[in-house]
Amino acid sequence: MGLHFPGTDVYTTRSHTQVDVWIWALTYTLVYTVLPLIWLKKRGFSLKKLFSSFRWIRDLWIIIAYWALDFFGPILSGSTNFLGGINANQYAQGISLGILVNTLGAGLPVVVMMHMIFIPRIAVLFKSKFTVILLGGLFYSIFSLFDPGVDYGSMETTLTSITYIIMTQTLVGMGKSTFTVVTGNPFVHFITLHVISARVPFDTKMYIEIFKIK
């Protein structure tokens, strides 16, 4: 089980079921969203105050520009087969369902654990924004150690997997951290560099197959 479904497995047709998806999504929601929010609330945290501090109009150009880059980039580069082979109804239901389960299993856990708990506390300890962004990136890479494609079956593949994740996902995490450090809004990355952007072209057809959407 990892940050992005199906964890350390590589998805193939009929390799995973709807039950697998919901177990992953609900487990990550409970462990990395609900319980941490309860902990934050006991320490005086207020979601109402957090949302009232956002400046959506100021940040709108960032959201649109980077969402477009992260959404269309994989499609135009040919790294995903998002276009073609399915009908409009499958697109509509597959995209909606994918956003829902990815929000529960990946989006909200990252928002809460990284952007609402880790980054604000690191920002208090370090004056350098770059240091905060770098440590945020490293945190995200650790969060990604059980993402699809890694292999911990032997010492050699374990070292290769860890090295690969840290080298690639640290940069991704730094991008996510930058949005929060610059805007103060932990949800900007959620739209621009996560669930509503790249995960849509990468995951839609997988969820259409798993949930047998016609």
Predicted regions mapped to residue ranges:
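Alpha-helical transmembrane segments in multi-pass membrane proteins
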Residues: 1-42, 89, 97
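Juxtamembrane "helix-exit" motif on the non-cytosolic side of transmembrane helices
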Residues: 2-11, 72-85, 145-154
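Structural signal for membrane-spanning alpha-helices in multi-pass inner-membrane proteins
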Residues: 35-40, 66, 70, 74, ...
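Short alpha-helical transmembrane interface motifs in multi-pass membrane proteins
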Residues: 16-21, 28-31, 69, 101-103, ...
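Membrane-interface helix-loop-helix regions
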Residues: 60, 64, 78-96
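Transmembrane helix-loop-helix hairpins at the membrane interface
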Residues: 79, 92-214
